[in-house]
Amino acid sequence: MNKRITVLSLLLATSLSSAAAMADDATELRAKLSNIDSLHATFSQQVTDINSKPIQTGSGVFALAYPNQFYWHLTQPDESLIVADGANLWIYNPFAEEVTVMDVAQAVDASPMALLVHRDEATWAKYSVTKRAVSGKSTCFDIQPKKLNSNVVAVSVCFEASQLVKFNLTDEQGNLSQFALTQQRKVKDNEANIFKFAVPDNVDIDDQRLKQAN
């Protein structure tokens, strides 16, 4: 009996220690993100399948600003645009001539990447964060939803000191999208309009905002 109690105690202690470490990791990641009031960068993208076979490469421009502002413009190989203006998230596919719009709060459920500009305590509580050291200069944080609500099952974000340098997305099919950032800087005052989206003429609009359903 004493041996069983000892084993259970060790398991409980290990579990509590692991939970505390993950909480500390989440706190550290949020502290790093809170120091980024805005960021503008170019990115290169590489997508591989579950067998590490290349599927696609691409490039574009990425920007974010607190609170809840996000800009993602894929320019190669096919253009697409994602803009979060603080209240709404707009997804524009020029080829399909279609715009999807949803609440920013829904964006976090659609992809944990939205956590980069989201600082709500209740939202972060839905995710587990684990820190891992990649090298002497780089530190990565793995983010996983505690309950899967989207096709993105894992996100990792990597820093060199306080600079965000790359992030990866893994979907439920096992495809890995890797994004490397370069030319990082703050968003300039005269660039603030990149977080505003004007709906183009002659496009279909799929309005998924929650207020539309009420």
Curated annotation (Swiss-Prot):
Keywords from the named record: Chaperone, Periplasm, Protein transport, Signal, Transport
Single biological process term from Gene Ontology: lipoprotein transport
Entry GO terms, CC: outer membrane-bounded periplasmic space
Gene3D superfamilies for this protein: Lipoprotein localisation LolA/LolB/LppX
Family named by the database record: Belongs to the LolA family.
Record HAMAP family: LolA
Subunit field text: Monomer.
Protein name in the entry: Outer-membrane lipoprotein carrier protein
Organism of this sequence: Shewanella frigidimarina (strain NCIMB 400)
